[in-house]
Amino acid sequence: MKAISKIFSALLLVMIVITSCTKDNYDAPESMLTGKVVYEGEALQLRGNEAVRLFIYQRGYEKHDPIEVFVNQDGAYSACLFDGEYQLITKSGNGPWSEEGRDTINVIVSGNTVQNVEVVPYYMVRNAEMKLNGNVVTASFNVEKIAGKEIDRVFFMLGTTQYINDGEHNVDRFDDADGAKMAEINVTGARYEFTPRDYTDNKMFQTALKRGTLFGRICIWPKGSDQGIYSEVIRLK
């Protein structure tokens, strides 16, 4: 009897384990929702590093907590989802764009699906140039004013990788927050030229030159915004 009891207990345990695994072993989502944050179809150049977020809500479910998605510095995002109906929206107060016109986008995910997110930025960095002349870096750009009111500051960053933003730049960040200058360039078409920077005595700069990898990026920081709008990454060496 003891042997039969042990066998029965073992079989019961196996059945419980199998049942438990069956309940927990749901299929993983396989459809990819991808796209970019854009202005008139043009991808925005952003901070990256989880600074810009999108919220995705699935319709028809009791749980209303959003799926949080981070936007890369080139404006791209992606999320792995189940097929179904979703709502996509930017996070309020997050990103270098106006709240006006912020709206929910209805998305039907069926297999791999592409959906861009159109926004109205405060400013755009246009015709960005950064040049290296020996140990001196020069930088300039044009301003495109869209929904912005005032420019808080402008700056350029240098780094040894292509991932550069206001918080990640291992060579230098050069700010200009002169109020008079910011007022002068607060108009579409204005050209701004940074004061040339001499990096003869900058050890990280000299190391970057020896390694042959130096990248730069320019940023306009709108007044009142939680972050700036950027140029594309520029390779100087």
Whereabouts are the PLM-identified features?
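Short, acidic Ser/Thr/Gly-rich low-complexity loop/linker segments typical of extracellular
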Residues: 59-74
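Short, ordered, surface-exposed loop/turn motifs in non-cytosolic proteins
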Residues: 42-62, 149-155
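Beta-strand-rich modules
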Residues: 196-228
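Structured interaction patches on ligand/partner-binding surfaces of diverse proteins
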Residues: 93-122
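A short, amphipathic beta-strand motif
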Residues: 31-41, 75
